[in-house]
Swiss-Prot record:
NCBIfam families listed in its UniProt record: atpD
Similarity section: Belongs to the ATPase alpha/beta chains family.
GO MF, one annotated term: ATP hydrolysis activity
PROSITE patterns given in the database record: ATPASE_ALPHA_BETA
Gene name for this UniProt entry: atpD
Assembly, per entry: F-type ATPases have 2 components, CF(1) - the catalytic core - and CF(0) - the membrane proton channel. CF(1) has five subunits: alpha(3), beta(3), gamma(1), delta(1), epsilon(1). CF(0) has four main subunits: a(1), b(1), b'(1) and c(9-12).
Keyword terms of this UniProt record: ATP synthesis, ATP-binding, CF(1), Hydrogen ion transport, Ion transport, Membrane, Nucleotide-binding, Thylakoid, Translocase, Transport
Alphabetized InterPro entries for the sequence: AAA+_ATPase, ATP-synt_VA_C, ATP_synth_F1_bsu, ATPase_a/bsu_AS, ATPase_alpha/beta_chains, ATPase_F1/V1/A1_a/bsu_N, ATPase_F1/V1/A1_a/bsu_N_sf, ATPase_F1/V1/A1_a/bsu_nucl-bd
Catalytic activity: ATP + H2O + 4 H(+)(in) = ADP + phosphate + 5 H(+)(out)
Record localization: Cellular thylakoid membrane
Protein function: Produces ATP from ADP in the presence of a proton gradient across the membrane. The catalytic sites are hosted primarily by the beta subunits.
List of residues binding ATP: 164-171
Upper classification of the organism: Bacteria, Bacillati, Cyanobacteriota, Cyanophyceae, Synechococcales
Official protein name in the record: ATP synthase subunit beta
Record membrane topology: Peripheral membrane protein
Amino acid sequence: MAAAAPASAGTKGVVRQVIGPVLDVEFPAGKLPKILNALRIEGTNTAGQPVALTAEVQQLLGDHRVRAVAMSGTDGLVRGMEALDTGAPISVPVGEATLGRIFNVLGEPVDEQGPVNASATAPIHRSAPKLTELETKPKVFETGIKVIDLLAPYRQGGKVGLFGGAGVGKTVLIQELINNIAKEHGGVSVFGGVGERTREGNDLYEEFKDSGVINAEDLSKSKVALCYGQMNEPPGARMRVGLSALTMAEHFRDVNKQDVLLFVDNIFRFVQAGSEVSALLGRMPSAVGYQPTLGTDVGELQERITSTLEGSITSIQAVYVPADDLTDPAPATTFAHLDATTVLSRGLASKGIYPAVDPLDSTSTMLQPAVVGEEHYKTARAVQSTLQRYKELQDIIAILGLDELSEDDRRTVDRARKIEKFLSQPFFVAEIFTGMPGVYVKLEETIAGFNQILAGELDHLPEQAFYLVGNIDQVKAKAEKIAAEAK
């Protein structure tokens, strides 16, 4: 039996006021739309040009009026235009049909590849999974990337903050993670572009096609769906596009029972968009001008990203830190939700060590003996203490030279340099421009390899043999090749 249509569906109202992206609409008495319902406004402006936009109801004002936020530009909108209550929240297409496609906040394809033949749509607003549905046992999410798996392991169904400036390899790291989850875990990914540059969104799409993550010939074989609300969009779109991407990811988790990767770039822009419309909605600004509902807004998004008994959504969120101030309310609120942080270092990138993940600054709540095991924990801490000692000695080396160090310190420096090189690895998605085949390294191989370096079993091998390889067997093979070439 078909469900009854909502009582307010199809009710027509009239636009009474427009202030930037915020508009007031008057409806007949007793037929007001519900909060978060989508309103559809279509008509022609004074110049005879067509105007069509969707707005989301945010407040009921009294006097039969509602206040709504537009999801696209309000140019040409005039008072007296008709607004139709759709009777439901904004809904987006979900399922396999979304793979390989680019959507806007309303779930409309924007890649000129024709309509999307999705068998289902889902509303972008829903409650987080119940406590009884959650997977409570912490489980490490293996990425196949040595530096992450060893020193800052990701939690399955957890949230990771990705910190890094321009040109240090954020995009390549994201692509590799998408590639690895598809090949090793049979999972798919959803990318939410929130308030970042349109050029970057286009570049990412082209790079996904080049690396095979999006199969241009057969879109059904693609491994990622893209949802963009870039920085030229009104704040309404930037405020909701993260939820549109999350809704697509939730379908893969709950219906297809898959492990999903959700990328959000950039989570700060989601907060920023909320603060832009908050004052227009008549709310009193809070600390540093942010919306008073900051904690709730972030919490509603983050609490839906989790592991259930059916599947998981593991989220990697790029975090922009305004003026490098970690105490700013936006990043500070985000940090409370993160299980791990992956910090990309310009210093490592300039040395040619990729992925340029900083082994000392990156952290994870999973790195504890009860979760990862005693051997993994001890190896990770020994690697970090060796690298920390090397960092402390660098000033002495720069002034006095390596020869002035004690025998022990020289050995530490030698091993630390090998560890630093061994933390690099060739990526599958970078094969096209490095010419080196990518490597997925199992966690056991990673731990065994670093243990051998720390124990001094590989002190006789040249440092260069550890650079851009997978496991220790490849190190030994590379060392033999270097020795043969030197003869």
